[in-house]
Amino acid sequence: MIHYGNCNKICEKTVMNQRTIKTAIAVTGTGLHSGQPVDLEFHPQPIDTGIVFERSDITGSTPIPASAFLVQDTMMSSNLVFGGTRVGTVEHLLSAIAGLGVDNLLIRVSASEIPIMDGSAAPFVGLLLQAGFCEQDASKKFIRIVRTVRVKVDDKWAELRPYNGFELNFEIDFDHPAIDKNFQHAQLQFSTQNFIERLSSARTFGFLRDIEAMRQNNLALGGSMDNAIVIDESNILNEEGLRFNDEFVRHKILDALGDLYLIGYPILGRFNAYKSGHALNNLLVREILSDHNNFEIVTFDDNVTCPIEYLPLNGITVEG
């Protein structure tokens, strides 16, 4: 018998137990590269099963665990491949899952890529909130960083340091008139509330010249100003402009949060990065997991002793 645990409304109390969603829920979006409709379903999962992807368009497809070791392609997104089956562009969805503290979830998708939605994590957050949450009868596990680990490629680098909480610091370096030099660094002290209010709605961005080149190769066919910030040689082309002055770097933090969740647990540590991307984020996670002296798995008896705030979600609304 599969044991999901006893359900409690998340708005009633904060818990340090594992959680899954209360009810299955589905949505249809557009594939960024294919431009075709993609069906996405979320289903509850038993304790200690983690985040698992499954291709609903392939009969008998092999489930794909959300693991950094299954990332085989980081060209513009994080893409998982297992048993010959691929699920791509997982980082925005994983960021939403991490931001809401979901430990166990089955994600069924009808194509080789997660739908792009509006280019942020906010639509996924709204969908998960609509599904509701179920507290499960098992302690929530965290991975605590106990030794600083840094990876570097050319002038780009990323690191995780010991820290009693979870903090993300990111700096980008774009010499472009539309990307203000004063807004190329951002910091997020992680909590559910900070994630929803300050990070979840930050959209992905791209340069018009790159999008045109990709379309010539039958890529980015679903990309538009409805799901990305588009920049030409001097301006932001979206009529509504930016959602935040520093939306570009906030989105890089959003990406990193999703990439880092492929470590398998919520992180206790300080993430610092300079010009990092999916490849370097993945390399960092693999490097940490390669040596058990870098980390320890811990649990907390209650929310008072846990240094991360998974706040009650009542009263918080998300557009998108």
Curated annotation (Swiss-Prot):
GO cellular component, as recorded: membrane
Top-rank taxon, per record: Bacteria
Catalysed reaction equations from the record: a UDP-3-O-[(3R)-3-hydroxyacyl]-N-acetyl-alpha-D-glucosamine + H2O = a UDP-3-O-[(3R)-3-hydroxyacyl]-alpha-D-glucosamine + acetate
Pathway entry: Glycolipid biosynthesis; lipid IV(A) biosynthesis; lipid IV(A) from (3R)-3-hydroxytetradecanoyl-[acyl-carrier-protein] and UDP-N-acetyl-alpha-D-glucosamine: step 2/6
Zinc listed as a keyword: yes
EC number: 3.5.1.108
Enzyme class: hydrolase
Residues given in the record as Zn(2+) binding sites: 92, 251, 255
The protein's required cofactors: Zn(2+)
A molecular-function term among this protein's GO annotations: metal ion binding
InterPro entries: Ribosomal_Su5_D2-typ_SF, UDP-acyl_GlcNac_deAcase, UDP-acyl_GlcNac_deAcase_C, UDP-acyl_N-AcGlcN_deAcase_N
Keyword terms of this UniProt record: Hydrolase, Lipid A biosynthesis, Lipid biosynthesis, Lipid metabolism, Metal-binding, Zinc
Active site: 278 (proton donor)
Family annotation (NCBIfam families): lpxC
PANTHER family on file: UDP-3-O-ACYL-N-ACETYLGLUCOSAMINE DEACETYLASE 1, MITOCHONDRIAL-RELATED
Family designation: Belongs to the LpxC family.
Protein name: UDP-3-O-acyl-N-acetylglucosamine deacetylase
Biological source species: Psychrobacter cryohalolentis (strain ATCC BAA-1226 / DSM 17306 / VKM B-2378 / K5)
